[in-house]
């Protein structure tokens, strides 16, 4: 469990099977990191909108928040691009148990990086007032 101040988060051991950026059918930029958990289940982590709607331009545009989230994912997992994430063993932090487990962050294993600090998605959003 990870103490985040008010709440305790669970963590689950996982292996990344696939990771990519995509633009959804509604033209929303997001990331997905797919993992297999130690106990045998699988899950997609992400689906977080990395861009924003510009009312003046009447279209979606890039955002500082989205750029920072991508940057932090790459730095946290010690890779240069999303394709290098495949095969990495990570901790997935989240709330809930079993099928109701909701991922809220991730980190490398300490054996891979003794200084590994978790990337908690809501912490990055809070830095940008989101």
List where the protein language model places each region.
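Short beta-rich binding modules
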Residues: 1-130
